[in-house]
Regions:
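Membrane-helix boundary and inter-helical linker elements of multi-pass secondary transporters
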Residues: 14, 45, 76-77, 105, ...
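Substrate-agnostic recognition of the 12-TM MFS/MFS-like secondary transporter fold
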Residues: 17-37, 60-94, 111-170, 185, ...
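Transmembrane alpha-helix termini and helix-breaking/packing motifs in multi-pass membrane transporters
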Residues: 40-47, 98-104, 160-180, 253-255, ...
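Short, glycine- and small/hydrophobic-rich beta-strand elements in well-ordered beta-sheets
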Residues: 455-479
């Protein structure tokens, strides 16, 4: 990917809607961190079971796996502003209810886990809508800086929130940490309510949630440009997430520090994350994206190697500072790559796939690195993770990130009407579409190459099967054939067309020798 002039880090803050939503997200993220501290501490006072204490974190994160894709589909089908608003209302009510029950001493382990899970549901539904809304709020040139600012907001909250939560719980009890979290959602509600989208949500033909999830999977299967950042972020996460599993063990058993020292080490990681976020726009102006990703991955590997030799807290803190820089430097760019590689109609689902894959990598790595530390040792496990990070660089060869600077993924103007006189129900089907091309022999090779790309586009946007044929008697006559489940799916296929797709169509048509457009015919399945 070529380097391109990027907006400064603070440029998105000049957009009033983004500025207010970003500020509100800081408040909300701090509230979420305080909630996590309060829930974990309350569970330790309700039970001596280490399993139940561990299940608090599971209850908070499991909704991403269960309904994350539903949230992504809803972000694409529904009004994102309304979805954001009502997901915040849901979380506010659940957090306030938990605070009230705790204040009245009615909270049991089951109640705590249930309401923690309920709050997680709201987050799993709202997060894809929030991330997909970035391009609805700021122009495309500001997206990378906006994502960097969101990362800074999260890491700043992660650095401050647990400390504030601990102080509040110690002073007033866990109930008030839950009330603080509930109050933090008010900031987001006010910001969302004040946001006036410049353009109304694009009208979408009827599609249910499960149909949208299926079409999202189909898009992912036939979109290498989306697969690449998801696969590479997953591989990076499997190795880099070793820090979350191994750091508590390193602090306790190798550095021999206490909880305060562990908090300082986490703070060093968070500080590095914030610093990296401020420098990313400058790096993007100077280096190509692949270069930044390679630099960040190598920096993480060096930091992990250093941690494998650390026996004192201060050098470990320095190493974690650079590890935090690498973490944000790599993941922000993968997030930007996902957001800018897909059109608006599927962006929520694309981000849901990304979040699901990355969270899955974190979950797997937790067990993997914990097990490995018990087998070969903590320091040695950091060294293995460093080697894994270096090896993960090889994935850039097999899954390169394509340049998005010249790609126009905006919706295409409407195609020519599909048989305006045809009376068909959206559920009618299956539908078979045939298109006949007249291609000169000397252009056949170029035509076939373009049609291989066309195949992926057709399958990605709704077709079930696709095939290209040539006439046995007239080798310059080609037949494109693809099948869809219903007439409604074919209408959706047209609605999903982007300007990039139209450019491909124009290249194909330039090889067609006929004076008229290639003849397209639509057939409906007939069981009689």
């Amino acid at each position: 990917m070529n380097k391109v002039n990027q907006a400064s880090l603070t440029a998105p803050l000049a957009v009033p809607a983004f500025r207010s939503l970003w500020s509100a997200s800081i408040v909300s993220n701090i509230g979420a961190m305080m909630q996590a501290v309060g829930a974990a501490w309350l569970m330790t006072s309700l039970t001596e079971s280490t399993l139940l204490v561990g299940l608090v974190q599971t209850a908070a994160t499991m909704p991403v796996f269960l309904v994350g894709l539903v949230g992504g589909a809803m972000a694409d089908l529904a009004d994102r502003k309304k979805l954001l608003f009502w997901s915040q209302v849901w979380m506010l009510v659940m957090a306030a209810l938990l605070g009230i029950l705790t204040l009245g001493h009615f909270t049991t382990p089951a109640v705590l886990l249930g309401l923690t899970f309920a709050i997680g549901l709201g987050r799993a539904i709202g997060l894809p809508a929030w991330q997909a809304s970035v391009q609805d709020i700021v122009p495309k040139p500001l997206v990378a800086s906006a994502v960097s600012l969101n990362s800074i907001a999260f890491n700043a909250a992660r650095a401050v929130g647990p400390a504030l939560g601990g102080l509040l719980v110690a002073a007033t009890g866990a109930a008030f940490a839950f009330f603080a979290n509930a109050a933090s959602f008010l900031a987001v509600l006010f910001a969302v309510n004040a946001w006036k989208p410049e353009k109304a949500p694009a009208p979408r033909l009827g599609e249910d949630i499960f149909g949208a999830i299926r079409s999202g999977f189909r898009y992912l299967l036939h979109a290498p440009r989306l697969q690449a950042p998801i696969i590479r972020a997953t591989m990076f996460g499997l190795c880099a997430a070793a820090v979350w599993s191994l750091l508590p063990l390193l602090a306790r058993d190798v550095l021999h520090t206490n909880a305060t020292g562990y908090g300082v080490l986490l703070g060093a990681f968070g500080a590095g994350s914030i610093v990296a976020g401020t420098f990313l726009p400058r790096l993007r102006n100077r280096f190509a994206l692949e270069g930044i990703l390679a630099l960040g991955t190598a920096l993480a590997a060096v930091a992990f190697f250093a941690l494998s030799f650390c026996r004192q807290p201060w050098p470990a803190g320095v190493s974690l500072f650079f590890a935090g820089m690498a973490w944000v430097g790599v993941l922000v760019n993968f997030n930007v790559a996902v957001q800018t590689s897909v059109p608006d109609w599927v962006r929520g689902r694309a981000l849901a796939f990304y979040l699901l894959a990355f969270q899955g990598a974190l979950a797997i790595s937790g067990a993997l690195w914990g097990w490995l530390a018990g087998v070969i040792g903590i320091s040695q496990s950091f060294a293995v993770a460093a080697v894994g990070l270096i090896l993960s660089l090889a994935f850039s060869k097999f899954f390169p990130l394509e340049s998005d600077e010249e790609i126009d993924l905006s919706p295409s103007p409407a195609w020519p009407e599909l048989h305006a006189d045809l009376v068909a129900d959206p559920d009618d089907g299956p539908v078979l579409v045939t298109i006949i091309y007249d291609i000169a022999e000397e252009d056949a090779s170029n035509f076939r190459a373009l049609m291989r790309i066309m195949r992926e586009r057709r399958l990605r946007d709704g077709a079930r099967r696709w095939r290209l044929y040539h006439d046995a008697k007239d080798p310059e006559r080609f037949l494109e054939l693809f099948r869809l489940d219903s007439w409604g799916e074919h209408l959706l296929q047209h609605q999903r067309t982007t300007m990039e797709d139209r450019e491909l169509e124009a290249k194909v048509l330039s090889l067609h020798r006929g004076k008229e457009r290639p003849l397209a015919t639509h057939y409906f399945g007939d069981d009689e």
